[in-house]
Amino acid sequence: MNQIEPGVQYNYVYEDDEYMIQEEEWDRDLLLDPAWEKQQRKTFTAWCNSHLRKAGTQIENIEEDFRNGLKLMLLLEVISGERLPKPDRGKMRFHKIANVNKALDYIASKGVKLVSIGAEEIVDGNVKMTLGMIWTIILRFAIQDISVEETSAKEGLLLWCQRKTAPYRNVNIQNFHTSWKDGLGLCALIHRHRPDLIDYSKLNKDDPIGNINLAMEIAEKHLDIPKMLDAEDIVNTPKPDERAIMTYVSCFYHAFAGAEQAETAANRICKVLAVNQENERLMEEYERLASELLEWIRRTIPWLENRTPEKTMQAMQKKLEDFRDYRRKHKPPKVQEKCQLEINFNTLQTKLRISNRPAFMPSEGKMVSDIAGAWQRLEQAEKGYEEWLLNEIRRLERVEHLAEKFRQKASTHETWAYGKEQILLQKDYESSTLTEVRALLRKHEAFESDLAAHQDRVEQIAAIAQELNELDYHDAVNVNDRCQKICDQWDRLGTLTQKRREALERTEKLLETIDQLHLEFAKRAAPFNNWMEGAMEDLQDMFIVHSIEEIQSLITAHEQFKATLPEADGERQSILAIQNEVEKVIQSYSIRISSSNPYSTVTVDEIRSKWDKVKQLVPIRDQSLQEELARQHANERLRRQFAAQANAIGPWIQNKMEEIARSSIQITGALEDQMNQLKQYEHNIINYKNNIDKLEGDHQLIQEALVFDNKHTNYTMEHIRVGWELLLTTIARTINEVETQILTRDAKGITQEQMNEFRASFNHFDRRKNGLMDHEDFRACLISMGYDLGEAEFARIMTLVDPNGQGTVTFQSFIDFMTRETADTDTAEQVIASFRILASDKPYILAEELRRELPPDQAQYCIKRMPAYSGPGSVPGALDYTAFSSALYGESDL
């Protein structure tokens, strides 16, 4: 077997087409590139399988499956559609070589000269030789026949691709390698021929692998083109294999070119059929139009020949209008149809003659001459029809005018007379008031005048009916019947009018009598009703009294009211008698009117009901007044009981307040003696609490009884409560002040004599004796004690004794100031010096030093309130004791 050395290349030459001579980039470089070899192996395998599957087989390994020559021969038979010589079935090497040679001989018979490709290399599985052989087959059977504008093979296929993809953005096909790397070219080919399979607008040029895979998947699924390329190989190879791409793209050409050829053949057939169908359509259209036109003529002629006169003007006018519509609307389109029918007939005959078709022969009776004859008969029937219509209309016009005049007058009279009989038959006066009856009588007089005015119209109606009978009006029977009904009704209206007048006059006299009785009733019932309403209001009036005298006055007034009841009852009976007389008259003459009084809104039932109500309220009022009298007696007892206690408690509280005040300002004796005296006062006050509680109980009873005044005492419970609470507050405050004075005296080293002197000075300048000095009193006090004060110094002292700026100085503030002025006190500097000792002369102190030197609670107090130290030499956790000490004495903003 001959081996192909690395530098050896195979060649193939077509006898008839020199463009197939090998090229350097197609043979030498391609077969030496492993990447290209991989692409060719996959593409050629897929291409072979796309044809072998038609024979129910396929290959897996291109260099192995063609070694025995059997599938190679089968591939050529499927591609060419021709039968090759019968293969050898042996499995020996020479059998395989013989089969491969048969295949190569067949290729050579198609005008392809195989150079350097021998059967032995194929049988030995030489990959490069096998790929070269398959490429030769692809060129001959898949690419050679491609021709676009006299170009062939590769150039033709490239030109076809360029034209198909020219309209697409980002697609520029210049070769069969790099121009296809982004996949948009394949997608554009599919979209150009099958836009339903792919949405080109959604493709992304930056996704070449996705584009290639999408195109191959759609081609495999919808175009029956198997996947022949590997998207990653195409994208990742600088220059993809040209043969592989040409092979795959040629499949698109054959898939779409076959469809175009079929479309061309179908268009040719459709064109021929369209001409024939158009001729048939014109024939059918002629037959249809001719039939419709002849049918219209057949229906119209009898209508035009009909001269039967109508009985009414409207019917004749309808005939005239129909004829005018015929001339204006119906006939012109038919004239156009007749003309168009002749044109269509001539056009059809011309088309048939040009297209070598036999002449058109309409069905029997539908020739152009038949249509012309029918049209002539139509125009003959049309003559004179309009003149006959106008004469008949003039004849009916006079009769119709009289008939319309009769109808108008009859309708006017009937409209006027409608409901008149029912009105005259009404007995509405039987249930009407006098005013309403008088109005009905005046209304009836107006009707009688109207009735007389309509006499002329009735006579005119009868005269017109007579004339229509003489003119032999077609509807004379109905006219006579209507006229007779009008005359009969007229006679009845005259009779009913006279009877109604008599009834109205009789009813008027009866109602005048009733009206006088109603007026008398109204004059007497209204005052009596007002009296009863006032009485009921007084009897139900809610009285509010606060003394026995007030309730006694109400009882006296009620007794006086009861004395007037017999006289009122007599008036009530007189009023009821008037109403009874009214009802007697109504029943005697069967007058169906309401017994209600038009002059009064007061009814008999209302009078009876209110009188009964008055009689019921009198004893109820008696009982309420007596109960209130008893309640006022009980309230008076409560007032006296409360007053007795309040008049004793009030002065007692006042006395105790005065005793405490005197004790608080005394300047003799020791503070301890003063404290003992105040404690005794406090004990006595607490023991007096039972009297306050008892008074509270009596006050609760008074409140429950709704007693709001008490003339027996000037003390109210609120006064007692305020005095008692003030007493408790005063004794507690006074005791606290003495305790504070003792504490201050002991803490500051003040002697009792000094304390007494301070008290004497404060009491002297406490001009209002309320335990407070204002600014001027305080200044005078200081001056009396030897202080020579300027404004600035006095202002400083005031901030000490009146820190809240209330404008007053208490005794305790005065004592604190005087003790600071006379005693030895600690200062912020002393406290800072003490903290500096604990901190070992550092400007800051640590928390552990505070916990070590101070009690736990005081150490925690300092740690919580001391600010952090941020001065020189600061360490983490350093605390500023200087700022803290200044804050203790009000010398800092902390």
Swiss-Prot record:
Residue ranges of the region described as Actin-binding: 1-254
Keywords: Actin-binding, Calcium, Cytoplasm, Metal-binding, Phosphoprotein, Repeat, Ubl conjugation
Spectrin repeat spans: 281-391, 401-506, 516-627, 637-740
SUPFAM superfamilies: Calponin-homology domain, CH-domain, EF-hand, Spectrin repeat
Primary site of residence: cytoplasm
Coiled-coil ranges (or none): none
GO cellular component: cell junction; cell projection; cortical actin cytoskeleton; filopodium; focal adhesion; plasma membrane; Z disc
Ranges for domain Calponin-homology (CH): 38-142, 151-257
Tree of life domain: Eukaryota
UniProt-annotated binding residues for Ca(2+) 2: D802, N804, T808
Subunit and interaction comment: Homodimer; antiparallel. Also forms heterodimers with ACTN3. Interacts with ADAM12, MYOZ1, MYOZ2 and MYOZ3. Interacts via its C-terminal region with the LDB3 PDZ domain. Interacts with XIRP2. Interacts with DST (via N-terminus). Interacts with PARVB. Interacts with SYNPO2.
Known function: F-actin cross-linking protein which is thought to anchor actin to a variety of intracellular structures. This is a bundling protein.
Name of the protein in its database record: Alpha-actinin-2
Organism classification: Eukaryota, Metazoa, Chordata, Craniata, Vertebrata
